[in-house]
Amino acid sequence: MSTRRQAIQGGDTIKNPATKFLSWKSNDKCFSYYDKEIAESLKGQPAETISKKANVKVNLPFRFLFLDQLQSVKGWSDALSGQIISNEVKTVSDQELNVVCYHKNAKGEPTKTTIAKGLYSQIKDAVVSAGAKYHKSVYVMLEDGSLANLQFKGACVKEWSEFFNRSKKRLADEWVIVESAKDGKKGAVKFTTPEFKFERSISDSES
């Protein structure tokens, strides 16, 4: 099993630090990730079938050790039928984002189109209108020692940020656990967010 120190330094997975990219599924009240190996094994089947089977739910409780957090924007462009992503930065207030959409051109060839470039405050309107949202990108170590990336957006950003800000001094030494979901409501829209708590201190062998 990897230790927290090895995970921060890259360990055996330095070429591809995160093995899973997880996001919170509000309706299901759990995390999920897209399994590329499952998707590859289903090649040739309808896209809806692949999407349903390759999106793997991770039931609660969910435990992790915090490693680092960055910020980015991600989303989907209906106009270009492609994925919008940006570079990850420590702070969007003073570091530029380069927001790009990866899609296919009229000939069906893979290409990319720049959506916007600059500080988030300067490009926010262009980014949102293109179909992307602000994300908090949190790198963690899972119970099996593998590295994962938690991608928070919307209400999940607020929930994580509040937990981080009030307890960041403890994050280096304790396991975080999500055992349940918190119900929320904005206008007529109901949603859930993960409820973060500390479970236990890390052992000497895990540090």
Indicate where each model-derived feature is located.
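OB-fold ssDNA-binding interfaces and closely related basic DNA-contact patches used
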Residues: 1-145, 185-201
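Short His-Asn-centered micro-motif
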Residues: 142, 152-153, 178-179
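Beta-strand/loop nucleic-acid-binding surfaces
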Residues: 146-167
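Long, compositionally biased interface segments
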Residues: 161-207
